[in-house]
Regions:
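Active-site core of glycosidic bond-cleaving carbohydrate-active enzymes
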Residues: 1-41, 45, 91-247
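Structural beta-strand/beta-sheet cores of well-ordered domains, especially the beta-sheet scaffolds
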Residues: 19, 51, 63, 90, ...
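Active-site proximal loops enriched in glycine and acidic residues that flank catalytic Cys/His/Asp
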Residues: 25-27, 34, 69-71, 152, ...
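Beta-strand segments within the central parallel beta-sheet cores of soluble alpha/beta enzyme folds
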Residues: 39-49, 64-70, 197-201, 249-256
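A general structural signal for short secondary-structure junctions and capping/turn motifs
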Residues: 58-59, 88, 138-140, 245-246, ...
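Short beta-alpha connecting loops at secondary-structure transitions
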Residues: 73-89, 217-230, 256
Length: 279
């Protein structure tokens, strides 16, 4: 994200060097659904080029490879009492590369070694390589929880517990697209009640005349309320509902059935449920 030449936007969100592995992780995830060798051969050159870039971009610091400079998108931290955003190896960078390199290895490529993120001293998943102070505890972004969702590599129980603490600390507010992310995260953590709470919040009626709305909600046509509107909120909540159904993270209020939800490896699931329980 961002254009280093003539960059006029804030470093709080513009100079992020990690879009490529995220996009390629999505391509590999698609491959795992269809397992088509022709498709795999089509995407392999992109993985080779991206891998070559990060082999060159990573630098050694304290005996470990890190990204630098980088940011945790749109967030800031406190360092010696000063608000800052540029740093090295934010957790999202680490988590993206951890998965990207794993995908590369499955494609037969040799990669550097990157360790998975670990819980901080407060039991949460840290947002940065160092435990900086927070400038906005309930920030709308949850970038540092990529290792939980949408990452395909299952997180450890320790990381899942740390993610729960992180989400509770961030709260249940945010823009519509932020609520979408949180629905997906709670669904991956198999907490259907918290996911459903956010879905209902996202479906709260918002007047079309609203100029700006930070708490989610939907216009009468069900567009995500974030003027003019942001489709991220709509797609994010839909993805979260699919994740809830896949993981049987069902709130007590739900009864119904699903048919043909796709899984990796060409598999699919169908089942009925009543009062939040599979039957």
């Amino acid at each position: 994200a961002g254009d280093p030449q003539g960059l006029e936007e804030t470093t709080q969100y513009a100079p992020w060097p990690m879009s490529a592995p995220w996009l390629l992780n999505q391509l590999y995830d698609h491959y795992l659904y269809i397992t088509d060798e022709e498709y795999k051969n089509r995407i392999l050159p992109m993985f080779e080029s991206c891998l070559a870039f990060y082999k060159d971009f990573l630098v050694e610091y304290n005996g470990k490879l890190v990204t630098c400079p980088s940011i945790s998108p749109e967030n800031k931290f406190k360092d010696a009492g000063t608000s800052a955003c540029i740093t090295y190896m934010p957790s999202m960078d680490r988590e993206l590369l951890y998965e990207f390199f794993a995908n590369c290895r499955e494609l037969g490529l040799e990669t550097p070694e990157i360790e998975q993120v670990e819980p901080a001293s407060d039991g949460r998943i840290p947002e940065y390589a160092e435990e900086f102070g927070e400038t906005e505890v309930e920030h709308r972004h949850v970038s540092h929880l990529y290792c939980i969702y949408p990452a395909r590599i299952p997180a450890s129980n320790e990381l899942n517990l740390a993610a729960e603490k992180s989400l509770l600390k961030r709260g249940f507010g945010g823009t519509g697209w932020s609520l979408g992310w949180k629905v997906c995260l709670w669904a991956r953590l198999k907490n259907g009640e918290n996911a459903y709470r956010l879905i209902k919040q996202q479906l709260t009626y918002i007047s079309p005349s609203s100029k700006f709305h930070k708490g989610g909600g939907s216009y009468p046509n069900l567009f995500d309320a974030h003027p003019p509107f942001q489709i991220d909120g709509n797609f994010g909540v839909c993805a979260g509902i699919a994740e809830m159904l896949k993981n049987e993270a069902l709130p007590k209020e739900w009864s119904g059935s699903i048919k043909g939800i796709k899984l990796h490896g060409g598999k699919e699931i169908s089942y009925s449920f009543k009062n939040g329980k599979r039957i």
